[in-house]
């Protein structure tokens, strides 16, 4: 059993008969009253996000996990299929296990958390950002750059993101995977 002082981002815990991954936390010590920890918990089974507050010293059940590198193979409409790069075993995951499934392109290597108790995959840790090619966007209008105007663009995986007006079809852009937002254009 762990306590609230052990809480950190990425920690997997069992709470209310489900397994959650801590995505955000904040230790709060008010001037009056006991300390507590505010957390955002993401269910690894349903994908739902839960805001929860633990009082200081509260005992939590930590889930032991291992990390393994997997290569994304393909998506068949219902499942995303991955192959372990060490022993070539394949697993399939539902969309709930992936934070931003439309940002993974075929052949990309990601880290998957696996529960050591039952060897079940829990979640996929994406890289901080990915580089994708813009396949469709409207042309930018000259003289419309006085403000930070954006336009929608579709990238090679089908994900839609708002980009600045100077981005054209065929450009490679970097997208932050945690929020799914445009970061920068990649020059070749």
From Swiss-Prot:
Q: Which UniProt keywords apply?
A: Cytoplasm, Elongation factor, Protein biosynthesis
Q: Where does it localize?
A: Cytoplasm
Associated pathway: Protein biosynthesis; polypeptide chain elongation
- InterPro entries according to UniProt: Elong-fact-P_C, NA-bd_OB-fold, Rib_uL2_dom2, Transl_elong_fac_P/YeiP, Transl_elong_KOW-like, Transl_elong_P/YeiP_cen, Transl_elong_P/YeiP_CS, Transl_elongation_fac_P
**This protein's record includes keyword Cytoplasm:** yes
Q: What is its main location?
A: cytoplasm
- Recorded GO CC terms: cytoplasm
- Any one Gene Ontology biological process term? peptide biosynthetic process
* Functional note: Involved in peptide bond synthesis. Stimulates efficient translation and peptide-bond synthesis on native or reconstituted 70S ribosomes in vitro. Probably functions indirectly by altering the affinity of the ribosome for aminoacyl-tRNA, thus increasing their reactivity as acceptors for peptidyl transferase.
The record's family statement is: Belongs to the elongation factor P family.
Q: What is this protein called?
A: Elongation factor P
* Organism lineage string: Bacteria, Pseudomonadati, Bacteroidota, Flavobacteriia, Flavobacteriales
């Amino acid at each position: 059993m762990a306590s609230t002082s052990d809480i950190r981002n990425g920690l997997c815990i069992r709470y209310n008969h489900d397994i959650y991954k801590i995505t955000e936390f904040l230790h709060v010590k008010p001037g009056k009253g006991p300390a507590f920890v505010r957390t955002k918990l993401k269910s690894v089974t349903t994908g739902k996000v839960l805001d929860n507050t633990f009082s200081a010293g509260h005992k939590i059940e930590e889930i032991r996990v291992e990390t393994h590198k997997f290569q994304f193979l393909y998506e068949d409409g219902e499942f995303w299929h991955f192959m372990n790069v060490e022993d070539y075993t394949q697993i399939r995951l539902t969309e709930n296990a992936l934070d931003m499934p439309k940002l993974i392109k075929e052949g990309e290597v990601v880290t998957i958390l696996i529960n050591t108790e039952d060897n079940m995959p829990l979640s996929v840790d994406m890289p901080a950002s990915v580089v994708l090619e813009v396949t469709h966007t409207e042309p930018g209008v000259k003289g419309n750059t006085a403000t930070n105007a954006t336009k929608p663009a579709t990238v090679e995986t089908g994900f839609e993101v708002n980009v600045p007006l100077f981005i054209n079809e065929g450009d490679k852009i970097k997208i932050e995977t945690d929020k799914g937002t445009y970061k920068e254009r990649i020059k070749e």
